[in-house]
Amino acid sequence: KEGFILDVLEYYITYPTYFKLVQTAYEDNSYSKDKSMKVLKKYVEQHPHSIKKKTAIMLNHFMSSTIKKIDNKAKAMLVTSSRKEAVLYKPEFDRQIKENNFNIKTLVAFTSTIKLDGLEYTESNMNKIEGKKSIKEAFKEDAFKILIVANKFQTGFDEPLLHTMYVDKKLSGVAAVQTLSRVNRIAPNKTSTLIIDFVNKKEEIREAFEPYYTETYLTGKTDYHKLYDLMENIYDFDLF
């Protein structure tokens, strides 16, 4: 049981670490001339604040790395802090997907109806899923690659093809354990997971897991030799 959860934490990185990873790789002669690295360098910023900028970072990471995992079947989840944030993220993802001619679709999950700038938003009118399929059923389709959630599917959601999680929400205690564990389901040829956290600190996540597990991978300072190993897992340079 421990190892099952530790696999989740093995490839957990905070956004500042991800930023340093890209910066370090870009300065390395082995990678600096690679086109995909130049694209990632363009979008990665030290302190991204706007939804537009964070969407660009996540989407370009997904298209440069995650999409090729699990025999090109891998999916991602974005955990947002509120229904409003989820409603704002969904059209921005869709806009950038269309702008870049990426052949993927997104889904958004939140409860009830939210009013924003005089308009009412629901899962139904934002997702426009054909037929009577649920979000869980639709997400199993190959076209739907990214699921944006607000206080939904953070517990009890079982999707083996979920490889990457982007976290833009404060997490603590058992909620952190339950949320991050969404990516730990086993699937054929699924050999890794990845969590990029924009909000929480490494120490906070370690503390959340400690009451339940005797050890974690989130200890000590960043070892850049390990980061290079992680980089090989994160980036597949033949995409662009």
Sequence positions of predicted segments:
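RecA-like P-loop NTPase motor core of helicase/translocase proteins
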Residues: 1-240
